[in-house]
């Protein structure tokens, strides 16, 4: 059973991009969507750019997540690059591709953009620090190599730090046991066997759908119900996609103008304005459409008004309970009384998840009232002493989401502190792109960006263009480094907290609030005000870099420390929440100092 990325350290060479003491303009960590996009765009600027990738091929999460049933929950063509060369001769077989088709897509991207020539595979970054005397990042890998770069880009996403609870005796389990994100390439055979799935997040739902029809007996261990929504997957033809390609540029432009970076947006109506019959009809239409339209294209007050939220939950629970046969299972998977607000945790998309529990061979284990405490050689031990004997275990236990991915790189500040130390009480970034004390470090699809509230590729391209433009300005203005001030970072954080505290998110432990990692700060880790507002705010920081300490090539320091763009949220906040963010900021500032 793999636990850490460093176990995959196995560089594919010792010369060229694999050489020790590598000198580059830009070093990127991660060769998924983020890293590939940044590499392509920065090479166009004439910058010597190299990517360090822990895995053995392109694709990021889709190289590691090859568990049974693994499939993206964003629809194409939105879940792909807007780069014309990449979509001109590419078509998909379905609106929700599986990991195999996504791997084929990345192979196609490499073919047309020649990506792999600048990607060093099997290269696991374990230490990085900015040398102020050279104005260069010094980056070290697990196998002992060092690289030097003016710009360092963390493109490791939100799920590169896996989470496996420290259950007693887990190392003694005799059968196959794998985390979904460290799944082996070979098939894990469960036919005729006793199998267990621990966790019912996105990957747990998908493995349940795959193993339910195959396993001799399947036990699914549940702590909290997942408000899963029908995916409504359908087959796509090449002809229908090719007919749409002339308007792809407009679609890619539109996705940056919606709240979640998809092609739909919230209804401007309140759930309380419609009659019961009108609400039911509206919910039914959203439900039949499938996908995240059910939550992200719903009434505007669903996540703000408890009554509106309960209306949506009741509709979902009624639909879901009707698909289940057993009353106990109904009460665990879709309780009459909601255990948390709808949308408080990220819903998953499913095809026949609930129907699996109508099989005689599939059993739902309540791991909340009777938690897992450890493993024996042959099974899973519960708090009351019960042992569930199984042959195969799938750990769908998730990630140290968002913040864990950057901390996992071992980055250290110019003050000598580690990012883990700096973020031990609360994460702070500026613009969801930079961190105070870490000059010339950029991160994307990570902490304090729209990340978990958005379509991934939309966020990546919006942030990626900003990073490219920031670097272009630095080169044009002969700037050696930029470092966001603590004041600017704190102002950005207070803005996010103001949104957090006016919403339902702090009412439950969730991925949005940092996950369930022991000792991790309980805080909103993504920017919640939507894609258009985010894009406008970060653009306000160019080309003059408000909120940054700027060091020129001659050593002159220019302190433009007043944060830019934060007041852009005022009108939006008042329209959405009925109160200005300033009062929330003042209250929070009193708490923080």
UniProtKB/Swiss-Prot annotation:
Gene3D superfamilies: FAD/NAD(P)-binding domain (3.50.50.60). Disruption phenotype: Abolishes the production of acurin A. Binds 1 FAD per subunit. Induction: Expression is positively regulated by the acurin A cluster-specific transcription regulator acrR. The keyword NADP applies. Keywords: FAD, Flavoprotein, Monooxygenase, NADP, Oxidoreductase. Pathway: Secondary metabolite biosynthesis. Its EC number is 1.14.13.-. GO terms for molecular function: flavin adenine dinucleotide binding; N,N-dimethylaniline monooxygenase activity; NADP binding. Its cofactor is FAD. Pfam families: FMO-like. The keyword Flavoprotein applies. The record marks 346 as: Transition state stabilizer. It is an enzyme of class 1 (oxidoreductase). FAD binds at residues 61-64, 73-74, 79. FAD-binding monooxygenase; part of the cluster that mediates the biosynthesis of acurin A, a highly reduced polyketide coupled to a serine via a peptide bond. The activities of the highly reducing polyketide synthase acrA and the nonribosomal peptide synthetase acrB are collectively responsible for the synthesis of the acurin A core structure with a heptaketide backbone produced by acrA covalently fused to a L-serine by acrB. After the formation of the PK-NRP hybrid product, it is detached from acrB by reductive release to set up the formation of the lactam ring by aldol condensation. Belongs to the FAD-binding monooxygenase family. This is FAD-binding monooxygenase acrE.
């Amino acid at each position: 059973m793999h636990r850490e990325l460093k176990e995959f350290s196995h560089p594919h060479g010792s010369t060229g991009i694999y050489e020790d003491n590598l000198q580059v303009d830009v070093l990127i960590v991660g060769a998924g969507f983020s890293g590939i996009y940044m590499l392509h765009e920065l090479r166009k600027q004439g910058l010597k750019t190299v990517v360090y990738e822990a895995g053995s091929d392109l694709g990021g999460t889709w190289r590691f997540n090859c568990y049974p049933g693994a499939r993206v929950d964003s629809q194409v063509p939105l879940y792909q690059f807007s780069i014309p060369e990449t979509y001109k001769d590419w078509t998909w077989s379905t609106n929700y591709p599986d990991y195999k088709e996504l791997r084929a897509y990345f192979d196609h991207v490499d073919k047309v953009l020649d990506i792999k020539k600048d990607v060093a595979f099997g290269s696991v970054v374990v230490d990085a620090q900015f040398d102020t005397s050279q104005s260069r990042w010094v980056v070290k890998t697990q196998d002992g190599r060092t690289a030097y770069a003016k710009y360092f880009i963390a493109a490791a996403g939100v799920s590169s730090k896996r989470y496996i609870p420290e259950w007693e005796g887990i190392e003694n389990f005799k059968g196959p046991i794998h985390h979904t994100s460290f799944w082996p390439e070979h098939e894990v055979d469960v036919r005729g066997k006793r199998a267990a799935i621990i966790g019912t997040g996105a990957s747990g739902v998908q493995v349940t759908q795959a193993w339910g029809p195959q396993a001799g007996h399947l036990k699914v261990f549940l702590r909290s119900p997942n408000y899963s929504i029908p995916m409504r997957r359908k087959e796509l033809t090449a002809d229908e996609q090719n007919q749409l390609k002339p308007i792809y540029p407009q679609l890619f432009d539109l996705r940056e103008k919606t709240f979640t970076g998809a092609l739909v947006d919230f209804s401007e109506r309140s759930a309380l304005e419609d009659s019961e019959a009108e609400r039911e009809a509206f919910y039914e239409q959203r439900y039949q459409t499938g996908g995240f339209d059910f939550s992200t294209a719903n009434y505007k007050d669903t996540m703000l008004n408890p009554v509106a939220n309960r209306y949506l939950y009741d509709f979902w629970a009624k639909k879901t309970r009707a698909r289940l046969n057993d009353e106990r299972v109904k009460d665990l998977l879709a309780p009459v009384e909601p255990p948390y607000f709808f949308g408080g945790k990220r819903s998953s998309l499913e095809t026949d998840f609930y129907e699996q529990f109508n099989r005689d061979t599939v059993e739902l284990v309540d791991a909340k009232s009777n938690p897992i405490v450890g493993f024996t050689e042959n099974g899973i031990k519960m708090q009351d002493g019960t042992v569930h004997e199984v042959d195969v275990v799938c750990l769908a236990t998730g990630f140290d989401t968002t913040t864990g991915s950057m901390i996992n790189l071992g980055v250290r500040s110019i003050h000598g502190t580690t990012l883990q130390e700096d973020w031990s009480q609360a994460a702070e970034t500026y613009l969801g792109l930079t961190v105070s004390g870490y000059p010339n470090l950029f991160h994307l699809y990570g902490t304090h960006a729209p990340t978990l509230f958005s379509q991934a590729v939309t966020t990546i391209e919006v942030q990626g263009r900003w990073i490219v433009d920031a670097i272009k300005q630095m080169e044009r203005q002969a700037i050696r480094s930029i470092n966001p001030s603590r004041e600017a970072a704190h102002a950005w954080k207070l803005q996010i907290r103001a949104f957090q505290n006016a919403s339902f998110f702090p009412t439950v432990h969730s991925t949005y609030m940092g996950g369930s990692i022991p000792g991790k700060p309980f805080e909103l880790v993504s920017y919640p005000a939507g894609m258009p507002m985010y894009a406008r705010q970060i653009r306000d920081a160019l080309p003059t870099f408000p909120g940054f300490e700027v060091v020129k090539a001659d050593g002159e320091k220019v302190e433009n420390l007043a944060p830019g763009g934060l007041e852009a949220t005022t009108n939006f906040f008042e329209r959405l929440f009925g109160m200005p963010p300033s009062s929330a900021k003042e209250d929070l500032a009193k708490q923080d100092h």
